[in-house]
Regions:
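Catalytic nucleophile-loop/oxyanion-hole region of alpha/beta-hydrolase
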Residues: 66, 93-125
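Alpha/beta-hydrolase fold nucleophile elbow
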Residues: 123-134
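Glycine-rich nucleophile elbow surrounding the catalytic serine of serine-hydrolase chemistry
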Residues: 132-142
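Short beta-strand element of the alpha/beta-hydrolase
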Residues: 51-61
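N-terminal cap/lid segment of alpha/beta-hydrolase-fold proteins
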Residues: 23-50
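The serine-hydrolase catalytic nucleophile loop
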Residues: 63-75, 90
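Conserved alpha/beta-hydrolase
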Residues: 75-97
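The alpha/beta-hydrolase serine catalytic core
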Residues: 34-37, 138, 145, 150-237, ...
Length: 277
């Protein structure tokens, strides 16, 4: 049995190495809303000087980072299909500057817009799309609403956490309880992480769907019925406000798509190829 497991590990490693051989990655720093953002630019192998290709901006979720498996698999598969990507850490996350306690959805939206401007300046950048998981999905949807279809050619949302506004109104975020009408300056979460009171104050009246509905381009929403963090009905509502969208409800899939990750990556990349290539 151990030999079988070892063979599986070796095969998985070889697959990752082969993916890496088909793409080029470069770590960069982008000026964000409260400091520098750590980012990775990944381009398809064989992209020649002067040639353009589509670029997808990949946004992680609350307490996540750009190096998550979902983000990595998506970027790798995009590169295999001739599409570049830029994945980055929001302020207060991963390797990016700024305290986690200073992070809010509005300043993550500002981060996303600054990353968009960076991507637009890349010499190889063609059409630009956005994808985001959880809170990153909310940020992607609102950023696309602000920038419009002329600038964002398609959007993919994975378990978009639009519940965050209702959580703030109820006074409960990620299991932490507080007075929503008078939140403390810091709310303890996990380990040493503390959520800032400004996060709650801004989330309380955040116009998530109102801003997102301004986006008129093609969109894809993927959500699981087993999501215990964000009920899939929040994903369904995006489908209702976006006429040019498709909705994939995955039976029993959890918030992180732990058992459905490859299926989610395949759906995501197939949709992006269809709308960008």
């Amino acid at each position: 049995m151990f030999m079988k497991i070892n063979r599986m590990i070796v095969c998985a490693a070889l697959m990752l190495i082969s993916v890496g051989l088909n793409a080029k990655t470069e770590k960069v720093w982008i000026q964000g809303s409260v400091g520098k953002l750590s980012a990775v630019v990944q381009t398809p192998d064989g992209l020649t000087e002067g040639e353009k290709c589509p670029v997808v901006i990949i946004m992680h979720g609350f307490m996540g980072n750009k190096d998550g498996m979902l983000e990595k698999l998506t970027a790798d598969k995009l590169a295999q299909n001739g599409i570049a990507s830029v994945k980055f850490d929001f302020n207060g996350h991963g390797e990016s500057e700024g305290p986690f306690s200073g992070m809010t959805v509005p300043n993550e939206i500002e981060d996303a817009k600054l990353v968009y401007e960076y991507v637009r300046s890349l010499p190889f950048a063609g059409d630009i799309a956005m994808t985001g998981h959880s809170q990153g999905g909310v940020v992607a949807s609102m950023t696309a609403g602000d920038l419009g279809f002329d600038n964002v050619k398609c959007v993919v949302l994975l378990a978009p956490a639009a519940v965050l506004r209702d959580d703030a109104i109820r006074g409960s975020t990620m299991g932490a309880r507080y007075n929503p009408l008078d939140p403390p300056e810091q709310i303890p979460l996990f380990g040493d992480l503390k959520l800032g009171g400004e996060y709650i104050r801004t989330a309380f009246s955040l116009p998530i769907y109102e801003t997102a509905r301004k986006y008129t381009g093609p969109a894809c929403i993927i959500h699981g019925t087993g999501d215990q963090v964000v009920p899939y009905t929040y994903g369904e509502r995006y489908h209702y406000i976006w006429p040019d969208s498709e909705l994939h409800i995955l039976h029993a899939a959890d918030h992180g798509f732990s058992r459905n990750m490859q299926e989610v990556v395949d759906l995501t990349v197939s949709y992006l190829i269809k709308n960008l290539k």
